[in-house]
């Protein structure tokens, strides 16, 4: 059975958390009984007699599922490759370096960068405009959402979507913050990727607690 169009709120129900931080889920409150329970649920207390290993594995699994859902359905294989790559490049004893490398593999993707810049409402919309050929990096068309950016890259857009971009920028709250490694010119719709990022600077941009240590250790068994 194809699960591509499965309602996303059902995945939130399993994880007991609104992973994407979207406000649209609240609009369904009156229509969905289960969703209403989800929005008003209280965290249960773990039994003192619970097995520590079982709880540890469960916590690892939940964090992994949150990351996969937040970055729009990353496959288990893709996430495993990224974690292995971060572990190989970084010193196994240097936790901060591993975290910076892994978060860079997530956030340096062009679809994620467009989302962080507030140019699009979500990562799925970013993937769509990229696949349709509306995004250019250093004057070259990019059609792969997996394209990795480097410091100094200039991102531009086709004139066909300038109205959409302007609408998205205006709909964002004034308090919406763009990460320090991005500079956006709202007048000519150009985006500059200025410098490398770090995990510490991105902690406040996630609507949930991102425990990268659990994610990495899950695949380094």
What are these regions (language model features)?
Residues 137-139:
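Short strand-turn-strand beta-turns centered on an Asx-Gly dipeptide
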């Amino acid at each position: 059975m194809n699960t591509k169009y499965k309602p996303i709120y059902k995945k939130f129900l399993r994880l007991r958390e609104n992973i994407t931080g979207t406000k649209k889920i609240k609009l369904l409150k009156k229509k969905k009984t289960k969703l209403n329970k989800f929005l008003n649920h209280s965290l249960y207390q773990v039994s003192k007699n619970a097995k520590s290993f079982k709880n540890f594995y469960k916590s690892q699994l939940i964090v992994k599922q949150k990351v996969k859902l937040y970055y729009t359905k990353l496959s288990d294989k893709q996430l495993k490759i990224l974690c292995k790559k971060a572990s190989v490049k970084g010193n196994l004893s240097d936790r901060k370096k591993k975290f910076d490398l892994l978060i860079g593999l997530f956030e340096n993707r062009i679809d994620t960068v467009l989302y962080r810049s507030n140019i699009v409402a979500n990562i799925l919309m970013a993937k769509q405009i990229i696949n349709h050929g509306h995004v250019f990096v250093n004057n070259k068309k990019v059609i792969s959402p997996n394209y990795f950016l480097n410091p100094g890259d200039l991102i531009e857009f086709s004139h066909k979507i300038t109205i959409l971009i302007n609408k998205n920028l205006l709909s964002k709250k004034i308090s919406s913050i763009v990460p320090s490694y991005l500079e956006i010119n709202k007048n000519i719709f150009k985006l500059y990727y200025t410098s490398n990022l770090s995990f510490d600077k991105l902690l406040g941009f996630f609507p949930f607690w991102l425990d990268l240590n659990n994610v990495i250790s899950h695949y380094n068994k």
